[in-house]
Structure formats: C-alpha cells, structure tokens
Swiss-Prot record:
Keywords: Plasmid, Virulence. InterPro entries: T3SS_YscI/HrpB (IPR012670). Belongs to the YscI/HrpB family. Induction: At 37 degrees Celsius in the absence of calcium. GO terms for biological process: protein secretion by the type III secretion system. The keyword DNA-binding does not apply. This is Yop proteins translocation protein I. It comes from the Bacteria. The keyword Iron-sulfur does not apply. Belongs to an operon involved in the translocation of Yop proteins across the bacterial membranes or in the specific control of this function.
Length: 115
C-alpha cells in the first residue's frame, strides 16, 4: 500500500459556532424564499378536491340545461336524441367518478395500513 502524504494546511480553520457568527442570507436567497412561500402549497389533495368541485359545477350546469329542455315539450326526434345522449353521458361520467373515488379511498386505506 503506497504512503499517502497529507500537506499541512496554511489556513486557519474555524472550529466553533461562535466564531462563525450569524448567517446572513443573500438577496437572491431571500427572493427565492419569498417566491416559494407565495406559491400555492396546498398539495395534491387540494388540487384533486378542486377538480372534483369543478366537475360538480359542470354537472350541475348540464343537469339544469337538461331539466330546462325537458320542461319544454319537444317533438323533434333530433332534440330528443340529444337529450338522451346528454343523460347517458352524465350517467357514465358520474359512474366513472364514483369508481375513481372508491379506488382512491382504497389506495389511501392501503397506504394508511402500511402495505
């Protein structure tokens, strides 16, 4: 095994915290910190709830439009087919959301159990 020589340090090394003194952040560090703190830090759960809320608002709008159309007697077969298609689409979307929410709750339960 070869010998390893370590050169003597010519600098004075600070070894205590008192010698270091208080740390002052730079202006760039302060700006980055302020920017990070001002961002939306609600997390994934908040964004999922916001999306579900937006979908709920969309459903309410579509359902109210459908109720308005149903209140008026429609004799046109095309309009009846469009209303039926809207109803089918709403039903399918609600079922998919219910299944997704059920699966997400199962995943959360699995994570909380630890595997």
């Amino acid at each position: 095994m070869p010998n390893i020589e370590i050169a003597q340090a010519d600098e004075v090394i600070i070894t205590t915290l008192e010698e270091l003194g208080p740390a002052e952040p730079t202006t760039d560090q302060i700006m980055r910190f302020d920017a990070a703190m001002s961002e939306d830090t609600q997390g994934l759960g908040h964004s999922l709830l916001k999306e579900v809320s937006d979908i709920q608002k969309s459903f309410k709008t579509v359902k109210s439009d459908l109720h308005t159309k149903l209140a008026v007697s429609v004799d046109n077969p095309n309009d009846l087919m469009l209303m039926q298609w809207s109803l089918i689409r709403i039903t399918i979307q609600e079922e998919l959301i219910a299944k997704t929410a059920g699966r997400m709750s199962q995943n959360v339960e699995t994570l909380s159990k630890g595997g």
